[in-house]
Amino acid sequence: MPELPEVETVRRGLTQQTLQRVCTGGEVLLSRTIATPTPELFLVALQQTQIQEWRRRGKYLLADLSREGEPAGTWGVHLRMTGQFFWTEPATPLTKHTRVRLRFEGDRELRFIDIRSFGQMWWVPPDRPVESVITGLSKLGPEPFAPEFTARYLRDRLRRSQRPIKTALLDQSLVAGIGNIYADESLFRTGIHPTTPSDRLTKIQAEKLREAIVEVLTASIGAGGTTFSDFRDLTGVNGNYGGQAWVYGRKDQPCRTCGTPIQKLKLAGRSSHFCPRCQPCS
């Protein structure tokens, strides 16, 4: 699933290509991609709207829309497992997994391609709070780059639970946007074993973990995200962070720090990669 850096990369691409452009029409090819309203009303709602801003909240993308200078609601998107946008010309042949296509002025088209078909879109009327329609937004914790995401906040939240620290980091109510890749990478940088109970984290470890999370996410955003399977930017280019990964996706390969083979284990149904020497189990 695309995580914060991948979604931020997409947001930047959407901003570059579609900001201030007017949507002139479109087609929904898979109705369940549109969570609300109906596919027909969704297309009507976006018709002749201009995109004023693309925002990101956790793994959600939010476009503020206007029509003739007046607010026209919010277009929300969650890529889920394999969703991706492709900016192209209308004459470009459709791929098998194209779910939504939207035409824009300037003879351009934005296509939503989703192999697994879990991605979702919403349109929120201008008189409704966005969180009342896209309810997952109300459950998100702070952004990793937000001032409120401090070491103290992190430790206070973690000390209430005995669940493994890796599992805790995947909880979007703790911090928004972190997934499997960057949880593994952050724990490695901090020297914390993924099975460490959350309530055992020391003050110093919490400080180092917060710093590692910010550093890892910043590095990945700078590299355009990570591509291990389906992620691409709007032009079809892979993310470049994968080649820099310390542990994720490197099972049995030597640790870049000490040479010990990277190990992999399952936690709550999710794979975790770690170095048994750099991240000893306490």
From Swiss-Prot:
Q: From which residue to which do the FPG-type zinc fingers run?
A: 246-280
The name on file for this protein is Formamidopyrimidine-DNA glycosylase
Q: Which Pfam families match?
A: Fapy_DNA_glyco, H2TH, zf-FPG_IleRS
Which InterPro entries does this one have?
A: DNA_glyclase/AP_lyase_DNA-bd (IPR015886), DNA_glyclase_Znf_dom_DNA_BS (IPR015887), Formamido-pyr_DNA_Glyclase (IPR020629), FPG_cat (IPR012319), MutM-like_N-ter (IPR035937), Ribosomal_uS13-like_H2TH (IPR010979), Znf_DNA_glyclase/AP_lyase (IPR000214), Znf_FPG/IleRS (IPR010663)
Please describe what this protein does: Involved in base excision repair of DNA damaged by oxidation or by mutagenic agents. Acts as a DNA glycosylase that recognizes and removes damaged bases. Has a preference for oxidized purines, such as 7,8-dihydro-8-oxoguanine (8-oxoG). Has AP (apurinic/apyrimidinic) lyase activity and introduces nicks in the DNA strand. Cleaves the DNA backbone by beta-delta elimination to generate a single-strand break at the site of the removed base with both 3'- and 5'-phosphates.
Source lineage = Bacteria, Bacillati, Cyanobacteriota, Cyanophyceae, Synechococcales
What cofactor(s) does the depicted protein rely on? Answer: Zn(2+)
Instruction: From the UniProt record, list the reaction(s) this protein catalyses.
Output: Hydrolysis of DNA containing ring-opened 7-methylguanine residues, releasing 2,6-diamino-4-hydroxy-5-(N-methyl)formamidopyrimidine; 2'-deoxyribonucleotide-(2'-deoxyribose 5'-phosphate)-2'-deoxyribonucleotide-DNA = a 3'-end 2'-deoxyribonucleotide-(2,3-dehydro-2,3-deoxyribose 5'-phosphate)-DNA + a 5'-end 5'-phospho-2'-deoxyribonucleoside-DNA + H(+)
Tell me which species this is from: Synechococcus sp. (strain ATCC 27144 / PCC 6301 / SAUG 1402/1)
Kindly state which keywords UniProt assigns to this record, in alphabetical order: DNA damage, DNA repair, DNA-binding, Glycosidase, Hydrolase, Lyase, Metal-binding, Multifunctional enzyme, Zinc, Zinc-finger
Q: What is its EC number?
A: 3.2.2.23, 4.2.99.18
Residues that hold DNA according to the record: 97, 116
* Swiss-Prot/TrEMBL GO biological process terms: base-excision repair
Quaternary structure and interacting proteins, as annotated: Monomer.
Q: Which residues form the active site?
A: 2 (schiff-base intermediate with dna), 3 (proton donor), 59 (proton donor), 270 (proton donor)
**What GO MF terms are annotated?**
8-oxo-7,8-dihydroguanine DNA N-glycosylase activity; class I DNA-(apurinic or apyrimidinic site) endonuclease activity; damaged DNA binding; zinc ion binding
Gene3D superfamilies membership: 1.10.8.50, MutM-like, N-terminal (3.20.190.10)
What remark does the entry make about the cofactor? Binds 1 zinc ion per subunit.
The yes or no answer to whether the keyword RNA-binding is present is no
Query: Can you tell me which family this protein belongs to?
Result: Belongs to the FPG family.
Give the residues annotated as coiled coil: none
